[in-house]
């Protein structure tokens, strides 16, 4: 009789059911804007956030000498997206010192290490590759890495470890305000559907979602190319120009087309971008049944009182 072989079933973060978690954030110097250390209390992965101005303090710690993966976070790109560079090193402190001399854009580093110092170079290489791939897929940040390179050869048991490490790191990064791996759009409902809203008229034919962060206009949505006269000289006109300059909206004939999913701070800003005029997004965005976003979301809150 053949011996049964164990199966390595690798689940990505988006495949895991959301569940309550306890996260601890430690402030070594008592400064909430200084170095911060985040952990999920039942796991061995730690994320240390280091302001560039406090890099010298981090270098003095034993954690800086460990194998780890790091994220350099910085100023906005031309497309209006925050920048990130993802790397790994057998000694993260030494590598950050090098990056301090060679890269200008970043102002904070987030370092992923093991509490038990059990992360190996093999782990780090796979984690770097997977993190870059996942960040590109999410599309939230402008990735400063050039080429992701080939998938590194990693034994199946170590790869399983890496997926668990990545899941933990993704949660901790988001907790520290850097949701590098989270998609803009909402997950499907239990019925496998998404709650979509539509903006039509005034040259617009857009699709989007209302999320916890704002309003996401989907890739492929079409909008009006020219602004109406009342928008000229206003901040909204410059806002639309930046979207075009950054390649978020691409001119195509007499229209603009969204080249990617894009998060707006409010439904109204999303409607302005599509229609080229002042607009109340709560009224312009409508569900498939014709109900406005206001009726579906804001009025629902009132009825819950």
Can you annotate each of these PLM segments?
Residues 72, 89, 111-113, 219, ...:
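Hydrophobic side chains in beta-strands
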Residues 101, 132, 136-140, 177, ...:
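Hydrophobic/aromatic-lined pockets within catalytic cores
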Residues 107-167:
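Internal, well-ordered alpha/beta segment that forms a basic, Gly-enriched binding/recognition surface
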Residues 88-92, 211-214, 300-301:
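A short, sequence-level motif marking secondary-structure junctions
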Residues 287-305:
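C-terminal engagement modules used by replication, chromatin/transcription, nuclear envelope/ESCRT
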Residues 189-284:
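Polyanion-binding interface signature
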Residues 2-101, 118-126, 130, 168-195, ...:
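GIY-YIG nuclease catalytic motif and its immediate N-terminal context
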